[in-house]
Curated annotation (Swiss-Prot):
This is Putative protein p12.
Amino acid sequence: MRVAITEGPSPCTALIRFQPKSFITFYKHQTFFTDMHYNTFIAYRFFSSASCRCDLRPDNQSLHWLATNNPLSIPETAAVHVLPRQAWRTLMRPEENGKNLFGDIAPAAGPL
């Protein structure tokens, strides 16, 4: 699945667009989860408002990030963590494990 990230309405936000329809907003230094591929939840931690895009690799375990301006900045642009569905649910239970491992988390895009 291909997604495109572009600058958002303020310097610290960006929009990620899932082809062909959905989108969520990235806030700098926050993490977002979405069910991009079957039962795998992927956490995105977005570190920059620079425009970039990413592609899901065939192994379904990682995303390939492509910065539009400077390919050398890819590692600083975004980090991706792949979590099984159950692990994602565990992280989202504050009554059981306190604060989640990734800091601020936005709602998942779609039902669990």
